[in-house]
A protein has these predicted regions:
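Carboxylate-rich, polar loop motifs that coordinate divalent cations or form catalytic acidic clusters
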Residues: 2-648
Length: 648
């Protein structure tokens, strides 16, 4: 009897212990599940990229007027029976005969960013076909023929789109310059796969499950079966730089600066057109069309026939082909070739190519403005990053004279002399002096006494000039030529900018600022010795007894006459001020930023505000004031605005 009672007690105890263990295990499993779900949610939230999807409103009058410059075509697509050509200045619509019908300008109807790709697609979340447009710095824009909408990532690096590929599911594959390959599914924007991040993507071809990804310097990646294979020069690729990819069935063709690599079922086969710089590819039936940099358009038989490629347009303007496209899926349909300077149609009879349309002509030579000035005669001087300069006559701006040679090539600064009428131009190949008529008179370089050939800035100094270079300073006046550099106490040899105020000159360098009185260095300012937030000084101007300094990464700062620094409320943070993109007028201070637009300070209130509407690019590079206007240069064109329109 006692043994039976004890057995029951032990049984009850065992059941209780077992139940407790099961409960404990259940709690642990439940908690583990919660943690796992939380981790997955956190990982998903971290991998997803925040973005804004918005409809672009019709433009308002921003006050900015364009100074016409050449439009560089980048790509084209057919849509609703018309041709749409995308380029640096915007989107241009043409009817079937090549006659212009509408145009949509960047900074007006479109975001202030060059357009780089365009294609037709039906995206997830949309019920109709649209033109899908890739931009250089404003994400993705879609257009249904009447309304534009934008997909703008919060991450600025994800806004620089380099390639787009719509898929059959309605997803959009997006190649970027710094964030690798992204996928947009209509609701979510995220990296395509962890192995394809941090790439500079140049081209996309294939499908979501069998995808070829071209890169700037890492060859080509083949995504298939949930994994990726890489091919570079060691695997048969003629060059690690990839500019074009075309896919048909199991075959893929990868073009670059040294020819075309052919792949079959993911395996390298051979090199076609060796030595040709191939920019774009199109497969038409049994023929591979290759648009090249210098060899026109090549027609290459896909079969192993041994026949040499057929060439078109090796002479004349049919060069530097940006895109080849067909109007339909049939090889007999119309074929188009897009270059920077025009669009060409293939002659169905003779097989050659004829010009169909071209971009609007411009007054200026180039769009990448690096320096501006208005001289005492009212002429506008426009310096370019790599195309010399234009001298624009009169306020009506109807005629421009172009100057470009071995010295007047990369222009950094233009300084007119109001007394003599002469103009000094700082270039990467010397200091070039022009007379009052705008004729080149003299080139001064290292051989003539400068400390370096590369001149970054010029400022008035006594009865002459002070010249900034990456190797230090050179003073040129009636006493002759002499130089200063770090050995003499200059804070850093690499001088970016100069600002003169009476006997004082402030030199902004890569390593801080130096204040000179005459040719004597009176003080140096760095982050270690002052309240300066960044040593890299890119721009400087004298103002109200002190100085304003622009930096590369810490915005603007004011230095008073005693050397005390104050950060600028509203224009500090991580702002990058472009070299010498700082100007003061009687009413305001203007600062040009890298990727953030134009910053304006009202001198009475001291308040800064940003201006982006009406600009052709958010990379503002130069200013000039004259003829009743403020001229604003960017890396994508020049605009002007009456100064009072900038007041708020």
């Amino acid at each position: 009897m006692t043994r039976s009672i004890n057995s029951r007690k032990w049984l009850v105890l065992a059941v209780a212990v077992f139940a407790a263990v099961i409960s404990l295990v259940g709690v642990v499993v439940w908690r583990a599940g919660v943690v796992l779900r939380w981790a997955k949610a956190a990982e998903s939230a971290e991998s997803n990229l925040k973005f804004t999807a918005r409809t672009l409103l019709p433009p308002t009058d921003s006050g900015f007027e364009w100074v016409s410059a050449p439009t560089a075509f980048a790509g084209a697509a057919e849509f609703n029976g018309h041709l749409y050509v995308a380029g640096s200045a915007g989107l241009f619509e043409y009817d079937g005969g090549g006659r212009p019908t509408r145009d949509f300008r960047v900074g007006r109807e479109l975001p202030p960013s060059p357009l780089v790709r365009v294609t037709r697609a039906v995206l997830a979340g949309s019920r109709e076909p649209e033109l899908v447009i890739a931009t250089h710095g404003a994400g993705i824009v879609a257009f249904n023929g009447s309304v534009f909408r934008q997909i703008l990532p919060d991450d600025r690096d994800a806004r620089h789109v380099t390639a787009i590929l719509p898929t059959a599911s309605g997803h959009l594959l997006i190649g970027t310059a710094k964030r690798g390959l992204l996928l947009y599914d209509g609701h979510r924007l995220a990296p395509f796969h962890s192995t394809l991040q941090q790439l500079y993507v140049t081209e996309l071809a294939g499908s979501e499950s069998d995808l070829w990804i071209g890169t700037m310097n890492q060859g080509v990646a083949h995504w298939h079966g949930g994994s990726v294979d890489w091919f570079s020069e060691a695997n048969g690729l003629p060059d690690a730089r990839v500019y074009s990819v075309a896919v048909a069935g199991t075959h893929a063709y990868v073009g670059g600066p040294a020819g075309i690599a052919e792949f079959d079922s993911g395996r390298f086969v051979r090199v076609l057109a060796p030595g040709s710089f191939v920019r774009t590819l199109l497969i038409q039936g049994r023929t591979l069309l290759a648009g090249t940099m210098d060899d026109g358009i090549l027609e290459i038989p896909i079969e192993h026939t041994g026949h040499a490629p057929r060439q078109f347009g090796t002479l004349g303007e049919l060069a530097d082909i940006r895109q080849l496209l067909a109007s339909g899926g049939d090889p007999n349909d119309s074929l188009y070739a897009v270059t920077e300077s025009g669009m060409y149609l293939r002659d169905t009879v003779g097989g050659g190519w004829k010009r169909l349309l071209g971009p609007p002509e411009g007054l200026l030579t180039d769009r990448n403005v690096s320096a501006l000035a208005v001289d005492s005669q009212g002429r506008l001087w426009v310096g370019y990053f790599d195309r010399g300069l234009d001298i624009v006559e009169g306020t009506n701006q109807q005629h421009a004279r172009h100057v470009e040679d071995d010295h007047v090539f990369c222009v950094n600064r233009i300084r007119p002399n109001s007394l003599s009428g002469a103009t000094a131009v700082a270039t990467a190949n010397g200091l070039v002096l022009f007379d009052a008529q705008g004729n080149r008179k003299q080139v001064i370089g290292k051989a003539e006494g400068l400390i370096a050939d590369h001149v970054t800035d010029i400022a008035g100094f006594r009865d002459g000039v002070m010249i900034a270079t990456p190797a230090g300073l050179t003073m040129m006046d009636s006493a002759g030529m002499r130089s200063l550099y770090a050995f003499h106490g200059l804070v850093n040899n690499h001088v970016y900018t100069l600002a003169a105020n009476g006997p004082y000159v402030l030199a902004g360098t890569l390593g801080g600022a130096s204040l000179l009185e005459g040719d004597q260095i009176r003080a140096n300012y760095t982050t270690a010795t002052s309240a300066l937030k960044h040593n890299w000084i890119t721009a400087a101007i004298p103002l109200d007894g002190g100085w304003w300094l622009g930096t590369y990464g810490a915005g603007l700062a004011r230095m008073d006459s005693s050397g005390k620094f104050e950060a600028s409320d509203g224009a500090s943070g991580d702002l990058v001020i472009n070299p010498n993109a700082l100007l003061a007028t009687d009413r305001m201070v203007l600062a040009g930023t890298m990727g953030r637009g134009l910053y304006v300070m009202d001198r009475k209130s001291g308040r800064w505000f940003a201006v982006t509407d009406g600009l052709p690019s958010l990379n503002v590079t130069a200013f000039a004031v004259g003829n009743g206007f403020v001229y604003v240069g960017t890396d994508n064109g020049l605009v002007r605005i009456p100064e009072q329109r900038l007041e708020r």
